[in-house]
Every structure is written in structure tokens, then in C-alpha cells.
Regions:
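N-terminal interaction modules that seed assembly of large macromolecular complexes
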Residues: 1-53
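Amphipathic alpha-helical interaction surfaces
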Residues: 7-10, 28, 43-51, 68-76, ...
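Extended amphipathic alpha-helical scaffold segments
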Residues: 15-19, 38-45, 86-97, 112-119
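Short, charged, amphipathic alpha-helical segments
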Residues: 20-21, 60, 87, 133
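Short amphipathic alpha-helical coiled-coil/interface segments
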Residues: 38-41, 63-66, 139
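Charged low-complexity stretches with an acidic bias
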Residues: 47-71, 154-162
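A charged, amphipathic interaction segment
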Residues: 56-115
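Glycine-rich, aromatic-bearing surface loops/beta-hairpins
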Residues: 94-162
Length: 162
């Protein structure tokens, strides 16, 4: 979704620009739904004051939900592999938070920003340093486990307190 927010910003939050630059590339039968979807996102971005920067509340809520689950998983002795993946990624998370000057930023937001940053580098065909690749590998592994547990939690298949 962060990419969608950026795509909307790149098109100046203007439905006409999105139509010309994005929507016309899709099959005709999908365009009406896309117009409505992007229109709703533009409205939300305007109402929430994130037209220039920041993230929609729905995206922030996902981070909050993931953080809640992360805290439950990491405080439970039932998930040692999850804790190990987290502690393997933690030095990279701390380093990234220090580098970006956002020491108070939630850890998971830092992780997603790192992944998104690498995605943007790859899209621009820019090199990724060995250190960054190593950090992203650890962070990706950690987030992959969290995503798996999140999916199980949403399906009510995750037993945290048994």
C-alpha cells in the first residue's frame, strides 16, 4: 500500500493523472473499479492530511496489529524460532533506526521501510550493498514468520496462550 500512496502522490493526487498514467494500462472491465478505488484513496489521503507524506490510518493500523502480535509472540516461550528470527534481525533494525534518525519509530515500521526502500532501489536498478542485502535477508525472514503467524491469527488458528 505504501507504493500505492507514492503512486498517487507521483500523480499529484489527481484522478485525471492516475487515469492517464495508470488506469488506462488495465483492461477496460477493471477500470471502473480502479477509478473508484483510487478515488477513495485520494479522498482518504486528503482527509487524513497525508497527500504530501505519511501513511493512511488503515496502513498504520496494520502496523499496530502486527506489533501487538509481535509482542505476544516474542514474550511467549512457545515460539522460540520466531524469537530467534527477531533477535537476528534486531541489530539491523536498531542500526536502521539510528541511521534514519527515527529512534522512536516502531520496529516493524522500520522493517517495512527497509523492504520498501530496497524495492525502490531494485525498481531503479540501483546497486544494493552487501551489508544492506544481509540486513534485508534477516528482516525478510523475520517478517515472513510474522506474516505467517498473522495469517494464522486472523484464521483463529494461532494458540498463543495454551
Amino acid at each position: 500500500m505504501w507504493q500505492e500512496e507514492d503512486l498517487i502522490r507521483a500523480n499529484h493526487c489527481e484522478p485525471e493523472e492516475l487515469e492517464t498514467n495508470v488506469i488506462v494500462r488495465y483492461p477496460e472491465d477493471q477500470r471502473a473499479a480502479m477509478r473508484e478505488w483510487y478515488g477513495n484513496l485520494i479522498t482518504m489521503m486528503s482527509e487524513e492530511g497525508v497527500r504530501e507524506k505519511g501513511h493512511l490510518q488503515i496502513n498504520k493500523n496494520v502496523i499496530l496489529n502486527l506489533t501487538e502480535l509481535h509482542n505476544a509472540l516474542s514474550s511467549s516461550p512457545k515460539f522460540p524460532f520466531y524469537s530467534a528470527a527477531y533477535f537476528k534481525a534486531l541489530p539491523f533494525i536498531v542500526e536502521l533506526r539510528t541511521k534514519n534518525g527515527k529512534k522512536e519509530e516502531p520496529e516493524l515500521e522500520t522493517c517495512f521501510e527497509a523492504l520498501y526502500g530496497v524495492l525502490l532501489l531494485r525498481l531503479q536498478k540501483k546497486p544494493i550493498s552487501e551489508g544492506t542485502a544481509k540486513a534485508i535477508e534477516a528482516i525478510s525472514s523475520f517478517l515472513s514468520m510474522l506474516a505467517n503467524y498473522y495469517d494464522k491469527d486472523r484464521k483463529v488458528e494461532l494458540k498463543l496462550d495454551e
